[in-house]
Curated annotation (Swiss-Prot):
GO biological process, one term: FtsZ-dependent cytokinesis
Source organism per UniProt: Rickettsia felis (strain ATCC VR-1525 / URRWXCal2) (Rickettsia azadi)
The protein, known as: Cell division protein FtsQ
UniProt entry tagged with the keyword Cytoplasm: no
Cytoplasmic side stretches: 1-32
Subcellular localization(s) per the UniProt record: Cell inner membrane
Cellular component annotations (GO), alphabetically ordered: cell division site; plasma membrane
Function of the protein: Essential cell division protein.
Length: 267
């Protein structure tokens, strides 16, 4: 009986030792895997974010580009959409790549950021259409007025952004003059567009005290608009024009600043 008990104890001890050994091996294995992961992360960080292995990176990158180019992944076409005032050579110059260049070598974010430096471009999207095409979608700023300030002329958009000094292609745009005129031109033009006949006879809009507008109409007629709610005043002037009671009355100025009482001055 004692011999059996002694034998059982030995078996249990051996089993316990085996379990302990397996646990140690698993622990060593886990630590080894963790160490390899940490080493791999460090290597990748050094490879990507530092100048270490710069020669290897260049060699590998060059070989990847050469291999993919042979497989047909090279620049053959550039599709441009939304282009109106930005000329094509300007866009292609920003690509900084020739036909046949590795398409994966193109830095799309850099191309996008450089294109956005052009004042005409409000937003732009650049993408690859594999295997051989780059697609560029432009959203250009739309000029709505010519702003005169400090004896200089600028094309401005509805947000008042200065687009260009080249106003020659846009002689039809309304001239707005004065401090802050560029900022508020968008709302004024939007209202005037409701009355095309009046819009066509408006030669300039003067911003006064950064508070209100004076309109200069053809025929040397000045329209003094109120500081607030000038929409009703424009509606009144348009009604006069449609009734043929504006340009043949020898008017010099219409003072519409007080909505309760309008004043008319004749020559």
């Amino acid at each position: 009986m004692r011999k059996k008990t002694s034998s059982n104890k030995k078996k249990q001890t051996k089993k316990t030792n085996n379990i302990s050994l397996r646990r140690k091996l698993r622990l060593i294995y886990k630590k080894a895997i963790l160490g390899l992961k940490i080493a791999l992360i460090i290597f990748v960080c050094l490879f990507v974010f530092t100048k270490y292995f710069a020669g290897i990176k260049t060699y590998l990158t060059t070989n990847i580009y050469q291999t993919t180019t042979k497989l047909g992944f090279k620049l053959e076409n550039v599709i441009i959409e939304g282009q109106q005032n930005v000329d094509e050579p300007t866009i292609l110059k920003v690509l900084n790549a020739n036909k046949g260049s590795p398409i994966f070598a193109l830095k799309l974010d850099e191309i996008r950021n450089n294109l956005k430096k052009n004042k005409w471009i409000k937003e732009v999207y650049v993408s690859r259409r594999l295997p051989n095409t780059v697609y560029i979608k432009l959203f250009e700023r739309e000029p709505i007025a010519i702003w005169q300030i400090n004896n200089q002329l600028f094309l401005v958009d509805e947000e008042g952004y200065e687009i260009s000094k080249n106003i020659q292609p846009f002689p039809h745009l309304l001239h707005v003059v004065g401090e802050g005129a560029n900022i508020y031109a968008g709302k004024l033009v939007l209202e005037l567009q409701k009355y095309p006949a009046l819009m066509n006879k408006t030669s300039a809009a003067i911003r006064l005290g950064d508070r209100r507008w004076d309109l200069n109409l053809k025929g040397n007629i000045s329209i003094k608009l109120p500081e607030k709610e000038f929409e009703e005043a424009l509606k009144y002037v348009d009604a006069l024009n449609k009734a043929n009671k504006l340009f043949n009355q020898n008017y010099k100025a219409l003072d519409l600043r007080d909505k309760n009482k309008y004043y008319i001055e004749k020559y």
